[in-house]
Amino acid sequence: MNLIYGAIFRRFFALAIFIFCYFPIFCFSKKNELKSKLITISVNGLLISSLISFFSLMYVHIVSDFSVLNVFQNSHTTKPLLYKISGVWGNHEGSMLLWILVLTIFNYFIFKLYNKKNSTFISKTLETQAFITTGFILFTILTSN
């Protein structure tokens, strides 16, 4: 059963990179109605996939699922619960995933709280944010286990 959560973590992380790679393409769309729908789907999908990724990693740390290499290297069965939770971002992979989660939450709030008068500015801001987050996700995938 616990192997499923490690797979969920990896699948949603891959989904996040897929969405981030296509997000800038959505921003270049000429039709405003299509553009706003695609950006809405992208921003929500990114937030959900990042949240699921981070919390599934947190779950496998809490239940001490040692089939996940990150848990095997950075956890112990006798650790108190608080240390297991804080141990999620106490290593390279977890801290990078937390940073990606913070970036996607920031991206979501930019999208939700923007002023309609500056939609071009917000679109460019979201596009730039997507490029930055894509870089972090690629770095995490390529340098982490």
Task: Label each residue range with its predicted role.
Residues 1-145:
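Polytopic transmembrane helical bundles with strong interfacial aromatic enrichment
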